[in-house]
Design a protein with these regions (language model features):
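Sec-dependent bacterial lipoprotein signal peptides
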Residues: 1-21
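Tryptophan-anchored aromatic micro-motifs
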Residues: 35-85, 118-120
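Contiguous, well-ordered beta-strand patches that form the walls/edges
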Residues: 68-73, 84-156
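Beta-sheet ligand-binding and adhesion/scaffold domains
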Residues: 131-190
Length: 190
């Protein structure tokens, strides 16, 4: 009888642990709500302070390591967007200065490695990077010393009624080391 109670207690404790583990998930960013401005927002969103933006972003270069399309219902496609469309065209890199971003991108159609500089501003009220013509922006989701997660405007597509709608991606960026950045600059200067 004691053995049966012991097994029952073990079973109850295991079920409780599994229940708590499934409730405490880091997947809060795996589902977005579409805001009135049409931009997806994560369910749990905390703005990134100006101090953290300066400390973690400015002066560093970041490489796209994951890109996932955000669907109209706010869910994220599991398949990597880069592989899905292009067989992975090569990651983009973003080097942030105080007021400019140098964007390094591989153009597989030519093929060529190109880079260009864009001006940006950081809107601290809603964490959007905007270049001069409001065409390209990120919305920061989370920032650490090594990883940045953003919502990225990718393009405009047509909807079923023939109108235009924005296409957004959930993107994970990793910070480059000084050596990696030097290698990127050398590769893209040729």
């Amino acid at each position: 009888m004691k053995t049966m109670k012991l097994w029952r207690n073990i079973l109850v404790m295991t079920a409780a642990m599994l229940s708590f583990a499934s409730c405490s998930s880091d997947d809060d960013e795996d589902f977005f709500t579409i805001g009135t401005d049409g931009i997806p927002m994560p369910a749990t969103y905390h703005s990134v302070s100006q101090a953290d933006f300066q400390k973690f972003i400015v002066g560093y270069c970041w490489k796209e390591t994951e890109m996932h399309r955000i669907n109209d219902d706010g869910s994220i496609e599991e398949k990597d967007y880069g592989w899905d469309l292009f067989g992975w065209c090569g990651p983009s890199y973003y080097e942030f200065g105080d007021q400019t971003i140098i964007h390094y991108v591989e153009n597989t159609g030519i093929p060529a490695y190109v880079h260009y500089t864009m001006n940006y501003k950081y809107d601290y009220s809603n964490n959007i990077y905007i270049n001069d013509n409001n065409h390209f922006y990120f919305r920061l989701i989370s920032v650490s010393e090594t990883t940045v997660k953003v919502i990225k405007w990718e393009s405009e597509t047509t909807d079923r009624e023939g109108g235009y709608k924005p296409e957004f991606l959930y993107v994970v960026l990793k910070r480059l080391t000084n050596k990696e950045l030097a290698d990127v600059k050398e590769q893209y200067s040729e």
